[in-house]
């Protein structure tokens, strides 16, 4: 089960998982550095059209989208990837 919370930034959402996502603390990943990322899961999310940045913690992801992208287009893919992870 994935819960979604709004953040103060309308271009960012917090996706909370019941499962552990990361065991290395908080990490930030930007689309501009996607080629340098070894984590396939993070790389896949960053390659979604409209995703700019991902902040990963133990049980949640905070995803920042481009201003002109729509959450209705991104949320289903993000949730699907999290459920499969």
Where are the model-predicted features located?
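Short, surface-exposed beta-strand-loop junctions and turns on beta-sheet-rich folds
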Residues: 21-22, 61, 69-71
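Short glycine-/aliphatic-rich beta-strand segments at the starts of folded cytosolic domains
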Residues: 7-32
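Short, ordered beta-strand-loop transition motifs
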Residues: 5-11, 55-58
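A generic structural motif
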Residues: 13, 59-65
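Short amphipathic alpha-helix segments
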Residues: 33-48
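Flexible metal-binding regulatory segments at protein termini and peripheral loops
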Residues: 3, 8, 80-85
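Short acidic amphipathic segments
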Residues: 45-60
């Amino acid at each position: 089960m994935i819960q979604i919370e709004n953040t103060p930034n309308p271009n960012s959402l917090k996706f909370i998982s019941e499962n552990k996502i990361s065991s290395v603390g908080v990490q930030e990943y930007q689309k501009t550095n996607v080629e340098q990322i070894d984590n396939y899961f993070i790389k896949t999310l960053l390659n979604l059209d409209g995703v700019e940045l991902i902040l990963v913690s133990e049980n949640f992801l905070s995803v920042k989208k481009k201003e002109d992208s729509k959450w209705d287009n991104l949320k289903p893919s993000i949730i699907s990837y999290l459920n499969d992870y």
